[in-house]
Amino acid sequence: FQCSGITSGQTRTVTAQDSDLIMAGTNLAQSFSKPQTGALVTLTPGSTVAWDMGLSNNYTLTLGDNSTALSNPTNEVAGTSGSVLLIQDGTGSRVISFGTHYFFAGGTDAVLSTAGNAVDRLDYFVQAADKVHCVVTKALAAS
């Protein structure tokens, strides 16, 4: 399906087979009868981890380096929220540091669980393009 030549304020009629066309608006309240689910995107592990927030709302990162820096995310949009599963590899005791866009309660970066295969969850809310509010829930059941 392709639209062209439609400008704001115009009305068009679209004919499509049942269940072939799903449209959502960006400027109105909407209700959905089923969950709207984004992909769980795997961040590439390493000593410095790049995070493109434009790919999804939910991510997973397995820590395998002794020290990992989570870089400031790209494509931050105010109002975006989601989660990042932070998973220790089998060795454990991996540490993480955060870029300057991340803000935690009390002004202190989160310290992760250190057991091998431990799972922590970082929940985030983007206040502005350079302000990502974060909270970490530690020691969740293994994934």
Where are the regions that the model predicts?
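Extracellular beta-solenoid/beta-roll
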Residues: 31-55
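Short carbohydrate-recognition loop motifs
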Residues: 55-61
